[in-house]
Design a protein with these regions (language model features):
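Partner-binding and oligomerization surfaces adjacent to conserved cores of proteins
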Residues: 1-372
Length: 372
């Protein structure tokens, strides 16, 4: 039942492929539905070693989204495609049915859409045809009129000039097309590296993650999505999705281009689903992590970004670090912000890790000292 509800949420999320459709009402509805499919009534967790934990995350109340380039698995977020074979498939596709020109028009349309919602494919095509088919004077008049009407920036004007040059090649020969997509492998890497990922999990008591990420000497932070009220934050966090485990499907750039050219809501949703499937699928060996991830994208950023969100609700610390200065700072910050603090400790009598409030642990230590 829960899986079906999640799949319905994912399907609904993908149906809003155009960001312009994400009105405040739509975002609020999506976020409300997300809260119903998240585990633990909207709470997710992040494990961190004390040695590498940045205390300012708690002081400034931000969540770190890491570039996919920094992920601990090079396969993670990589597209399951052979770039050399993809180039050949794309060349063949572009040489058929004037698809190269159609793609140029669509690419420029997508660049202008956010700033010029009234722009149409036909308006761009008419401009390109007029400039390339008529003399220099008429072509320049059309170019200037188009730039003025849609208030193009200097950068957008230059992109239009480059598009005109490619569009005007009557032969549409293989050499021109091959040259224009020759850096596909580099582009694939840039797309991956510009993805910003926040990886979370379903619980605080995963011994394997305490060992792998914290070396049994770290913290686990609890994030409560119910504390998100801001529209812009909701818009970011509606992209929180469940990671799938198994073999990635083969990825085809031609299929994405076809969907973009079709330009229907259904086709765009399918394209988004194909791309996100690559970003959300990991090998079965990672299954125990039960990961949920929030995905964003910042072109050119291969480091990561801070997302300011005051959504911490509890912090779990391993008993071994309680005397560390950084741990004391964390506890003090938790008290100031009314976050719950729990301690993870190993029970020799039960041969199990247990969790209790820091108040109870402190009382127990105090009582033991009195006995001794």
């Amino acid at each position: 039942m829960a899986d079906n509800a999640y799949k319905e949420y994912e399907k609904k999320l993908y149906s809003y492929a155009d960001n312009a459709l994400l009105t405040e009402e739509v975002v609020n509805d999506l976020f409300k539905e997300l809260l119903t499919v998240l585990p633990n009534k909207g709470k997710l967790y992040k494990y961190k070693a004390l040695s590498t934990f940045h205390i300012d995350e708690l002081e400034e109340k931000y969540i770190w989204f890491s570039s996919a380039k920094k992920l601990n698995d090079k396969k993670d977020c990589a597209f399951n495609a052979n770039s050399l074979k993809e180039i050949e498939s794309m060349v063949k596709f572009f040489l058929t049915d004037d698809n190269y020109r159609k793609t140029l028009v669509n690419g420029y349309y997508l660049q202008l859409l956010s700033r010029c919602p009234e722009i149409t494919h036909k308006a761009i095509e008419d401009c390109l045809l007029c400039v390339t088919k008529n003399g220099q004077r008429i072509g320049k008049l059309k170019f200037d009129k188009f730039c003025k009407e849609y208030k193009l920036t200097t950068e957008q004007k230059q992109v239009l000039i480059n598009t005109i040059q490619l569009y005007s090649d009557e032969a549409q020969n293989e050499g021109v097309i091959r040259n224009s997509i020759s850096n596909l492998h580099k582009q694939m890497q840039e797309v991956r590296n510009s993805m910003q990922i926040c990886s979370l999990t379903t619980s605080y008591d995963k011994d394997s993650m305490w060992a792998y990420y914290c070396n049994n000497a770290g913290v686990c932070i609890e994030y409560d999505f119910n504390k998100i009220n801001d529209y812009e934050l909701k818009k970011k966090f509606i992209n929180t999705q469940k990671v799938r485990y198994g073999r990635k499907k083969k990825f085809s750039y031609v299929d994405i281009i076809k969907a973009k050219l079709e330009n229907t809501q259904e086709a765009m949703a399918k394209a988004d689903e194909m791309i996100l499937s690559q970003l959300l699928t990991k090998e079965k060996s990672w299954r125990a992590e039960e990961e949920w991830r929030t995905i964003g994208s910042v072109r050119g950023n291969e480091t990561g970004i801070k997302i300011y969100a005051d959504i911490v609700s509890a912090i779990y610390l391993d008993y071994s670090i309680l005397k560390e200065e950084k741990a004391k700072q964390i506890i003090e910050l938790a008290e100031d912000n009314k976050w719950k603090v729990y301690v993870r400790y190993f029970s020799d009598y039960e041969a199990e890790y247990r969790y209790d409030t820091i108040e109870n642990i402190s009382k127990l230590i105090s009582d033991l000292k009195q006995i001794i």
